[in-house]
């Protein structure tokens, strides 16, 4: 089913091999259920409410089977099997919590804790750490290792990203989300064995967007946020859901608040059109709320000077001035903002129409929306949704650097190509990240991009439908030409 949240690797596996209609019957912990042929055991279990623990497995990304926490017992198989790579089969009987499985997970945790520091009381991840939860659940309260722990010094990769190699369990989530999800490839693995650790591709520092996805996806406290470090514990904060206003995507974000101060932002419940995704602006761009330059109280002009006053006095003054203008038959113009929510703009236009009696309402916009709406008049073309980007067979990106102007759309488009093999075509002024996987990429300056489309007509005509994403550089008559094309 279409969803803005990335679908699992098991769904991609089924889709590519044409197994979507084939169902098999399996039994998991005594519960009989059906699943699409090719579905991974870990996903089939989740659908019936059975959670198989895993550190390296993450829905939507390539499989690793590195942590061995997802081992399950399968009838007629002599050894335990990793549930994150094992596809279901007809008649399969799976035990996810048998004594044999429990002992294996306890042993795995003992290995993971061999060099892991026991610094939960001072670790930022304490209270929401997946490793901590698993140790409480399965034990491993004692260690048979008497050797000195191998320890590596914490590294600051950037102002926002810190890495502690001693805490890292090498699940490779951060590498995969940066490479596969974002197409940046800023992280890699160096050394081997006990000396192995995650390393920036450019040596000792990150060269990326600093979106913080690697921090959020880390199951332990190996990657921490420079803006949140040592400020609070998860249980000490209240959480409020809101909508990011830095671009028109409208991503859901959850603000963590303590004593009236925003300490961090993420999308902890993975709701909204963006699922778990947030770009750098959505994750870290909230500091303006607490800026010292922000007005804390209304200002009114008295004797030529702006002075602080109360809300009551300020609103009374504004109401009186508005009334005087209306009595003189004056006209009003109201300017809204693209950085406020739909609800706030709704009340602004309601105030303008009912309170001021004017329909002169506008806002600043960078794109040529008026030309676009005029070009669509009487046409059959439909406006695409974010979900369409994940399901479309083909997409055209023209006149925009998608990863910078609309990061969520770039994220979804890349996921579609990774999971479904969709075709992407790009016509831009300079190199863009979509070039990495695009079927064809063309370079064209502003005003020349529509003409350059003729070179893609043959490729695009092969697809029954195409989702088109165009940027600010396509304006005026070019918008109408694009719709007609």
Predicted regions and their residues:
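Tryptophan (W) side chains
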Residues: 12-13
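Eukaryote-biased recognition of intrinsically disordered, low-complexity regulatory segments
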Residues: 21-29
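Short, contiguous acidic and Ser/Thr-rich linear segments
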Residues: 31-39
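Conserved short loop/turn motifs at secondary-structure junctions
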Residues: 32, 55-60, 164-165, 197-206, ...
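A basic, amphipathic helix-loop patch mediating RNA/tRNA/ribosome contacts
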Residues: 41-75
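Fe-S ferredoxin-like electron-transfer domains
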Residues: 68-245, 249-251, 258-262
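Catalytic alpha/large subunits of respiratory electron-transfer oxidoreductases
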Residues: 113, 117, 229-485
């Amino acid at each position: 089913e279409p969803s803005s949240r990335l679908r699992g690797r098991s769904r991609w596996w089924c889709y590519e091999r044409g197994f979507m209609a084939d169902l098999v019957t399996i039994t998991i912990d005594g519960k009989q259920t059906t699943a699409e042929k090719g579905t991974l055991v870990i996903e089939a279990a989740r659908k019936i409410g059975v959670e198989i623990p895993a550190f390296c497995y993450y829905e939507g990304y390539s499989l690793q089977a590195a942590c061995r926490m997802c081992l399950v017992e399968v009838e007629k198989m002599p050894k335990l099997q990793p549930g994150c790579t094992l596809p279901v089969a007809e008649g399969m009987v799976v035990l996810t919590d048998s004594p044999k499985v429990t002992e294996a997970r306890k042993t795995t945790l003992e290995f993971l804790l061999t060099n892991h520091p026991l610094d939960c009381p001072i670790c930022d991840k304490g209270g929401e750490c997946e490793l901590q939860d698993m140790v409480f659940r399965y034990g491993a309260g004692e260690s048979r290792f008497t050797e000195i722990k191998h320890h590596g010094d914490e590294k600051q990769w950037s102002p926002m990203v810190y890495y502690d190699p001693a805490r890292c369990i090498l699940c490779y989530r951060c590498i995969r989300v940066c490479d596969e999800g974002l197409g940046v490839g800023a992280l890699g693995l160096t050394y081997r064995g006990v000396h192995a650790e995650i390393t920036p591709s450019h040596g000792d520092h990150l060269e990326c967007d600093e979106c913080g996805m690697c921090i959020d996806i880390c199951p332990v406290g190996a990657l921490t946020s420079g803006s949140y470090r040592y400020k609070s514990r998860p249980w000490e904060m209240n959480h409020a859901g809101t909508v990011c206003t830095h671009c028109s995507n409208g991503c859901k974000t959850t603000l963590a608040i303590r004593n009236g101060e925003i300490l961090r932002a993420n999308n902890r419940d993975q709701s909204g059109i963006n699922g778990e995704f947030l770009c750098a602006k959505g994750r870290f761009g909230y500091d303006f709320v607490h800026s010292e330059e922000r007005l804390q109280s209304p200002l009114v002009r008295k004797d030529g000077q702006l002075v602080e006053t109360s809300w009551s006095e300020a609103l009374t003054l504004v109401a009186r001035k508005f009334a005087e203008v209306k009595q003189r038959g004056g006209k009003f113009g109201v300017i809204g903002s693209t950085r406020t929510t739909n609800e706030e703009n709704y009340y602004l236009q309601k105030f303008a129409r009912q309170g001021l009696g004017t329909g002169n309402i506008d806002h600043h916009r960078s794109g040529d929306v008026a030309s676009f709406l005029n070009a669509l008049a009487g046409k059959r073309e439909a406006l695409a949704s974010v979900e369409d980007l994940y399901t479309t067979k083909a997409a055209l990106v023209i006149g925009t650097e998608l990863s910078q102007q609309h990061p969520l759309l770039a994220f979804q488009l890349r996921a579609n190509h990774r999971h479904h093999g969709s075709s992407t075509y790009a016509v831009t002024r300079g190199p863009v990240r979509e070039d990495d996987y695009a079927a064809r990429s063309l370079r064209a300056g502003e005003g020349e991009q529509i003409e350059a489309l003729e070179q893609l007509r043959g490729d695009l005509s092969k697809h029954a439908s195409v989702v088109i994403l165009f940027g600010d550089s396509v304006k005026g008559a070019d918008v109408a030409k694009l719709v007609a094309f």
